Every structure is written in C-alpha cells, then in structure tokens.
Amino acid sequence: MGNAYLGGWRRRVFWTLIALAIPALIAVCVESWRQMQIASSRAELDDACERARVDVLGGMTPAQFTQSRVKGTNGYERLRKLAEAIDNAPPIGPGTFEAADDSEPFTPMGVSKVLGVQEWPRLKRDPPDAEKTRLFLAATEAWSAELEEISRCDVIAQVIHDVDTYGDLLGGDSLTWLQVHLRSLWFMLARANGHALIGDGEVAARQLLTIARLYSLMRVPLCELQLNTRAWGISSVLNLALHWVKEGRIAAAQLKELTSFNMDCEPLLPVAAKGEMASKILFEQWVQEWPSEVWFGWARPDIEDSPFDDGDRQNKYTRGIRYREGWTTGLRTYAAQVLELQDQSPPYIVRTADQQGLVMSANLQAASTRIHSQQVEIDAVRAELLKLMAK
C-alpha cells in the first residue's frame, strides 16, 4: 500500500515537472528562433545596403557622397536660417492680412501665405490693403537683401553630415527642407506680388529674378521631392512673369536675364535618385534598430504589418522583421532602377517594380512621369516669354 502510494506520488511529480519543463523548453526554442529571424533580417538588410552603397554611391558613405557633389559656396544653411526667421517673426501690426478670399495673421509668414500662394489673377481681382502691403514690404526689406546675397552663391543643396541621423535629415529640431523651401518661396513671391500690386514693376521684376536665380542653384536635389519642388518653383516664376508681361505691368526686357538661368529639371532625375539612395541608406540605420519579436507566420497571415500601425496588438510580434524584409527588397529594386537611369537620357523610362508594394520604387516611377510633364510646361512657358521678348 505504501509503496503504491509512493509510486503514484512520484508519477505525479514527474508529470508535473514535465508539464513545467515543456513550456519552458518551447519558450527557449521560440526565443532561439526569434533571434535567428531577427539576425537574418538584419544581415539581409545590411547586405542590400552595402551593395547599394558600393554600386550607386561608389563606395562612399551618404555624407561623403552628398558633400562630394557640392562645389563652391553652399547657401543652404543661410536659406534655412532665414526661413526660420520668417517663421518665427512677430506681427507686423494688429489684425489680419486679407486678399483673394484668404485671411492670415498680419505677420511675415501670414502675408507670405496670402500673397505668395494665391495666383496672380485672383490677387488682381481681390487685392490686399495697399498700406498693409507697403508695411510688409518695408518690414522685410533686410530679408530680401539677404536672399539676394544667397542667390549669388554657387549652389543651394542639402547635404548629409557625418554625425547626422535620418531625423536630422528631416530637419531635427529645425525646419525640414520642404519647409525651408516653401517659406523662402512664398516670401519672395509675396514680395514680388506686393510690389507689382502697388505699381512698382521694376522692383517686382528684380524680386522675380532673385527667385529664379535661387532655383537655378538648386541643381543637386537630395530626393525626388526636392527636384519636384524645383520644377514647381520654376514653373510658378515663369507663369507669373508671363502674366505680368501680358498685362503690361513690367516690360519683357526687364526679365531678359530670366531666360538665361538653368531651368532644367528632367535631366536632374538621376541626380535626385542617387541623392535619395544616400538618404535611404541613412534611414537603414534606424530600420536596423526597429524592435521586434517574431510571431508564428501562420498565426495571422492576413495582417498588414507596419511599424507605424499599432491597430493590431499582434503587429508588435512581426512588424520589425517584416519591415526590414520589405526594406531590403525595396533597397535592391530601387538601386537597380537608379543604375538603369544613368545610361538613359530624357524622357526616362523607369521599369515597373517587380514586387507589389515597393513604395520607393513606385515613387521613382511616378516622379519620372511627373517631372517630364513639368519640364514640358516649363519649356513651353519659357518659349512664349522668349517670343514676347523678341518683339
């Protein structure tokens, strides 16, 4: 009896230990598998990044590559500081600034949004208060002179520094490149439109020429977005000049210098694509560190894992690895597309991405189409201006 009881107790202890050991063993196996998956995804991403760096950037780091493209004096930092000053400037006076059914605070930035963003025909139909326009022009004269000096630099280009992270590339604690661009463009267009509205055509023409010079210097874009904004800015300047000449507000001869500036945008697509490659390699450092755990692939095969989507609680188990895997495929495809561009001439043909969802590759394909249509428009308006100047 005693022996039977002792044997039963031992069996219970044995199975209890087995019951405790199996989950622990499974946890160890899953953790080991998890670490293998993480290490594998990081190794694949490293390989794709290194191949892109060697094949596209000639073996240089993103900082070395972007800095090597800039020759002479670079006016970007001066432009950024001026944009920050415009952004943070106090009110010029009380109340608001209104024109063309638009209203903003009576600050340099507010006036820039009204006079710089609205198209000329609308401003002409519904002009702002002339006295407030004069106050704005007087209050911002020093900034205008600074932009005139910046336009005499050799180039305006954002570069990557040795200690930069991807967050620094996006602006860090300062303005992003796009914000710098928009604030300076809106500001100068606002001053040009302001002078034209109060009848000072000669100064308006000088302001327009300064904007055109600034855009002619933005010939080393760091991404397709920067190339697109260059094209948009040049198009805006040319169309505004055409309006003024046709209306007789300024003489075509006053803008003769305008047509001598470098207005090529489409030929810069390979330059922008290589710059984008440099920024994506910098971004890879952040992707490498994305925290993740692995969940069994069959657990939720239907979910779209994204590091930016916390809607599904199980995303946290797979999103890091899947994101790295997607980024690896994207880098390889994008690098191949960039290299294909180097042997072409406009209009460029960008092959379709061979895997659905490769956003960076799709962006390059869309950029090639968009930039081509913008270049056609720029060339057409420029040709029309040349005809008016020849009369």
Tell where the protein language model's regions lie, with residue ranges.
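Short acidic linear motifs
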Residues: 2-391
